[in-house]
Amino acid sequence: MSDMHSLLIAAILGVVEGLTEFLPVSSTGHMIIVGHLLGFEGDTAKTFEVVIQLGSILAVVVMFWRRLFGLIGIHFGRPLQHEGESKGRLTLIHILLGMIPAVVLGLLFHDTIKSLFNPINVMYALVVGGLLLIAAECLKPKEPRAPGLDDMTYRQAFMIGCFQCLALWPGFSRSGATISGGMLMGVSRYAASEFSFLLAVPMMMGATALDLYKSWGFLTTGDISMFAVGFITAFVVALIAIKTFLQLIKRISFIPFAIYRFIVAAAVYVVFF
């Protein structure tokens, strides 16, 4: 594989990762399709995916850095407020409660979860996750009990964490599971999305660090330029995607995302079966 070809693949996969990681459409489903079509699979590809996820995580940190520092009691001037936010009552306890269920299950069943990573399971997860998005839109309270992040209760945070366990099923989508769970628990669509992004930082950093540690042996100096291009591309695209997504959900429901998931599931079937 030539250097230019490798860099092109890195850029393409960086765009795919950045666009899909925080949208409720399953980055996993997209990555396995695109990776397969590009012929980029195997241990190096898996390590590459882990590295570019760090770029997506960094985009959330940049986007919500004031809020993240505020969670640990560090404030810089007047806190930035996003739509639906109030006086800064969201605490680190909310984040911890949202993390606990998936962390416990993830550690207990790590090997089993990894064994589920195959096209057929991803295809089913795409469909079930799409149905959950539709259910969340249809069954959510007419008036959210938590219109903003700072209106969320500890119980709501914990229940969102329970829904996040669904994302241990490869292809389900972590953001899809948490946002749907939040809406069903009475959190507004916008606030549930923001909480999902904040929750992603410790969850994804922990999971990515573990995967990177286990994949370290597959890294070579020859891969540095390719990994750097993928990382930077994923960061820039994720930053744009997050901003656009938060504006978009003010105007539309998640039904279009659910339909899109069904289309991706069909694409997985066509490509792999």
UniProtKB/Swiss-Prot annotation:
Main EC class the enzyme belongs to: hydrolase
Residues in the signal sequence: none
Catalytic activity: di-trans,octa-cis-undecaprenyl diphosphate + H2O = di-trans,octa-cis-undecaprenyl phosphate + phosphate + H(+)
Transmembrane helix listed as a keyword: yes
Subcellular location: Cell inner membrane
Enzyme Commission number(s) from the entry: 3.6.1.27
Sequence intervals crossing the membrane: 6-26, 45-65, 90-110, 116-136, 190-210, 222-242, 252-272
GO biological process: cell wall organization; peptidoglycan biosynthetic process; regulation of cell shape; response to antibiotic
One annotated GO molecular function: undecaprenyl-diphosphatase activity
Membrane topology: Multi-pass membrane protein
Keywords carried by this UniProt record: Antibiotic resistance, Cell inner membrane, Cell membrane, Cell shape, Cell wall biogenesis/degradation, Hydrolase, Membrane, Peptidoglycan synthesis, Transmembrane, Transmembrane helix
Xref: InterPro entries: UppP
PANTHER family linked to this entry: UNDECAPRENYL-DIPHOSPHATASE
Function: Catalyzes the dephosphorylation of undecaprenyl diphosphate (UPP). Confers resistance to bacitracin.
Miscellaneous field: Bacitracin is thought to be involved in the inhibition of peptidoglycan synthesis by sequestering undecaprenyl diphosphate, thereby reducing the pool of lipid carrier available.
Protein family membership: Belongs to the UppP family.
Name of the protein in question: Undecaprenyl-diphosphatase
Upper classification of the organism: Bacteria, Pseudomonadati, Pseudomonadota, Gammaproteobacteria, Enterobacterales
Recorded name of the encoding gene: uppP
